[in-house]
Structure formats: structure tokens, C-alpha cells
């Protein structure tokens, strides 16, 4: 085969016909053959002659990519045909080396992503193995304990946090026993988890007692102590039962770890030296570093602290002492410092840390805001905040009344802000219209006329001549000794009948006006009784006798002359 034959074999279909049509005579045989061919065949021949198709399997590659996207769930299966057609059209329209290189780059990216995913999975194999082995270890443990179930479950959660977050900790199992290996600066620490949990089984529910703490501590093996020490780095308040031995020992271990991290301020000095080397101010460098490491503001926990039953009783006793000292006028700092002087020594030794933290908080509250401290002491339901042990106190600042004349202008909230007295307020009073006022005046005039008709009308001088003067001179002219027992009383049946008729008329009268019920009650006459009460001062008889039996007259006159009636402000009307 010659070179020309080889070229013709490799040439695309239709290129030769197009070349013959271009090289032959005008309107020749080759030109007429191409002109009379179907339009689709003629178009395909021209396209193949102008842009020959690639022979590197573009269609197969596009099909593989579309199939892979469908298998990964990136596209729906019913969209494969349309997407494949569009991609082929774009590839054939822009069929060049750039398209082929783009497709190859996409394939390389897919291969690189798969390799990176495999590497990440291999890197997480250790973490997955640790979590799996730790789950197997928990499944092999006892599920319940006699006392301290909350501590048991909380400690398992802390152990899982430790294993998942510490990169140099590895859990492994051997012959039914599980252990954790911790690599520290080239040396390793092996802790047998099975033995540690068996050692802790009788201690889960132990209480923190200053007397029994040495006995409980003697039961802990070095293996168990090491486990408690490492796990305590993830301890937080509320993870275990308050007042228990494990809760206090974990808290003490965590405070020891925190104090040991930067006991001499080495970390702060290193930061300062680094900032100086970078020609930055230390405060700016420290703020930037804190933002990069933390990227959030620390908000102290203000929720009430969970206390044990013993701590609850101790808190109530101490707050009761502070309330009494506040009533007695004892200075707050002295009362807080001496509030434990009458505590039982064993109780104080057991709760020494809690009492000292409480004193620190109360002293800080009293120093920052005495009003807030007084409110805490007087509140019987107050509980210390969760920041009692951490020192992150949230205490409102006291307002300084320097620009006002008196604190009374900005005193505490009034009673109206807490109590709603609207339920007990009297209802709105309805004012009388003109017709009702006229009717009320007519009723009053009718009552007054009826009373005058029943009781009679006299002048003040005539009434005194008929009642007071005879009584005064009767004792002076009498030559016999008189007393309250031998004085005959005049009949008063007519007066009682009149009083009953007046009372019946008063019951039919509506005396309620805008002034409230009983506003016209002073108009009612007072009816005298059958018992003599005596004369007024200065009008007593000259004869020495006790009582007022010598007074004569009707019952109404005796009632008028009664000193008690005068003191009550009752008066008889005169016209």
C-alpha cells in the first residue's frame, strides 16, 4: 500500500468527494453528484471534510462521565440521555485539544478526590477503631450499680469524650480485657479500663465526707487514679451527682490540671516574647490569638448551681444567719466572714470548698452592689449560680447617684409594678341626672316633714324650758333623798310607736347618692331607751345621789342629754 493509499484510508468519509468536486470542471460529474445527494448526506460530507472527528473515544468518555454522575446520585437517571446528547453536541461543536484536555483534567480531579477520600478514611481508621472498641468495652460492663447510677453513666460519657478528642490515646483489647494507651512526650501510659471500672464499682455512690475520704481513697488503685486524672480534663459541673466523692475528686483533679498548665505564667511570657519578635504590641497580639483560637465571647453560666441535700441545708442555715445579722445591723463583711463560726466541725470540713466559694461570691456581691447583696440575703429561694466554682460572677453594677439630689428619686420599683390592685378598686360612680336629684330632694323634704310631724317642732328656748330647767330645779327644790331606783318614769309607749313608724319610713327611702351608702344616715333621729343615763355636766342636781334617776321627761330628751351621744356627734335638730 502506497502512502497515498494510506492517507486515503485514514481520511474521513466524504473528504475525497468534496475534494473531487472542488478540483473538477465547473458543473462536472463530481459536482453534480454532490449537488444531487440528499441534504443530510451532503451536510455530513461537508462537516466531515471541514472538521474531521477525533478518534480518541470522546463519546465513550462522555458516556462514562454521565453514567458515573448518575451512579453517585448527582443527576437523575431519566436525565442521562438529554445530558449525554447536550455534552456530545458541545464536544462536537468545540472539538479541539482544549476540550480533550478539559475532559482529561476532570478525570484526573475525580481520581485525586477518590485518593484523598481514601486517605482521610485511612486516617480516621484509628478513631473508628477506638470508638468501636470503647463501645465493646461498655457492652461488656455491668449495666446498673447499687448506688451512683448517675455517676456511672456520666463517667462513661467523659471517657468517650476523652478517647474521641485526644489524638494520642488508643484503645485496644486483649484476651477479654480492654486498656487505653496514652502517649506523652515519647513515653506511654497504659491504663487497664476493665480493672479500673471494677475498682470503681463500690465507689460510684460514695458521699464526700471529710472523715471517710481517706478510707475511700485507700480503695483506689494507682491504675484507677490515673484514669480519673486523665478523664478529669473533660469534667464539667453537672456531669456527676453533687456532693458525691467522684464529683469532688474530679473537680479537684481538674483544678490541679488547670493550675499546672501555667503555674508560673510561662505561657504568657512565651506569648509576650513572640509578640515582641513579631514587632507587635502584646495586647493586640493576645487579642488576635484569642480570637483565632476561640472566636467567641465567653458568657458565664448564670443558671442555679445544683446542690446536694446536705449543701441545701447548709445554705439555708448560712443564709438565715446572714438575714439575722442584717436585721441586727452587723456589717456585711463581718457577718459573711464569721457565718461559719457555729458550724459543726465535721460538716465544715466536708463542705469547706463550697463554703469558701460561697463566701467569696457574697463578698464580691456586697462590694460591687450592696443592694443586690441585700436582695440575695432576703430571698429564701436564692441558689448560687453555676459560676460559683469558676469565679465567673455575674453581678449587676450599682448606680452611683451623684447627679441627683437623693436616691429616693431613683428608688426601687414601686408596688404597682408587682401588684395589680385594679381588681379591688371601687367601680365607677354614676352621677345622678337632674330628674334623680329632684326626686332625692323631694324624698328628703318628705322625710323631714314626717319627722317634724311625728316628733313635733319647738324653739330651742321652749325646749330647754320644758326639759332641762325642770330637771335642774327639781333636784334643788326637793327635800327628800332621791336615787335612780325610786324615781318613777313616765310612760313612753307613744314614743315607741312613733319611732317604729319613723323606722319603717326610713326603710322605704333610698338614701344612696354620689357620696356612697349611708351618706344621709346622720339625718336619722336617735331614739332614747328606758334606762336613764344622767344629766349633762353643770346641770346635775344639788342633792348628793348617784345616777340620773331624778331626771324627768321623755326618752328623746334623755337621749339628747346623754354625754355619750354628744361625744358621738349626734345632734337634735331645732327649727
Curated annotation (Swiss-Prot):
InterPro entries: Hex_IIIa, Hex_IIIa_N
Organism domain of life: Viruses
Keywords tagged on the record: Capsid decoration protein, Capsid protein, Host nucleus, Late protein, Phosphoprotein, Viral genome packaging, Viral release from host cell, Virion
Propeptide: 515-575
Pfam families registered for this protein in UniProt: Hex_IIIa (PF02455)
Site features described as Cleavage, chain residue numbers: 514-515
UniProt xrefs under HAMAP family: ADV_CAP3
Summary of the function given for this chain in its UniProt record: Structural component of the virion that acts as a cement protein on the capsid exterior which mediates the interactions between the hexons, including the peripentonal hexons, and reaches all the way to the penton vertices. Two hexon linking proteins IIIa, one from each facet, stabilize the unique edge interface between a pair of facets. As the virus enters the host cell, hexon linking proteins IIIa are shed concomitant with virion acidification in the endosome.
Protein name: Pre-hexon-linking protein IIIa
Annotated organism of origin: Fowl adenovirus A serotype 1 (strain CELO / Phelps) (FAdV-1)
